């Protein structure tokens, strides 16, 4: 298995798809990277030369924030919003949707499993 940016990328997949295993690299960025480095997107990872792998690694690390750097930047942005107490920071702190989605229904992923609240007991006659 080839390693790029600290990630094992699968040997049997086309390089265009295999690059998407790296956090911060999607299909569009993978295509841009391959076009800039002059590597055929249809070639399999196992068929890449060491020279091509080095070129890919240098291009990705030089032009984009990927993997750990990107994760750290995202975490820092969230912490900063929480610290300055802006609306998005308050939503992050409460564990609610941040970007204006409805919460009366839905938003279960963000809110977690339902917690049942005890209701009124029936009056006995």
Swiss-Prot record:
Example GO molecular function: structural constituent of ribosome
Protein keywords: Ribonucleoprotein, Ribosomal protein, RNA-binding, rRNA-binding, tRNA-binding
InterPro entries listed in its UniProt record: Rbsml_uS13_C (IPR027437), Ribosomal_uS13 (IPR001892), Ribosomal_uS13-like_H2TH (IPR010979), Ribosomal_uS13_bac-type (IPR019980), Ribosomal_uS13_CS (IPR018269)
A GO biological process held by the record: translation
The UniProt record lists the keyword Ribosomal protein: yes
UniProt key word tRNA-binding: yes
Record-level GO cellular component terms: cytosol; small ribosomal subunit
Region called Disordered, residue ranges: 90-125
Function: Located at the top of the head of the 30S subunit, it contacts several helices of the 16S rRNA. In the 70S ribosome it contacts the 23S rRNA (bridge B1a) and protein L5 of the 50S subunit (bridge B1b), connecting the 2 subunits; these bridges are implicated in subunit movement. Contacts the tRNAs in the A and P-sites.
Family statement drawn from the similarity comment of this UniProt entry: Belongs to the universal ribosomal protein uS13 family.
PANTHER family for the chain: 30S RIBOSOMAL PROTEIN S13/40S RIBOSOMAL PROTEIN S18, SMALL RIBOSOMAL SUBUNIT PROTEIN US13M
Protein name (database record): Small ribosomal subunit protein uS13
Organism (species): Bifidobacterium adolescentis (strain ATCC 15703 / DSM 20083 / NCTC 11814 / E194a)
Lineage: Bacteria, Bacillati, Actinomycetota, Actinomycetes, Bifidobacteriales
Gene name of the encoded protein: rpsM
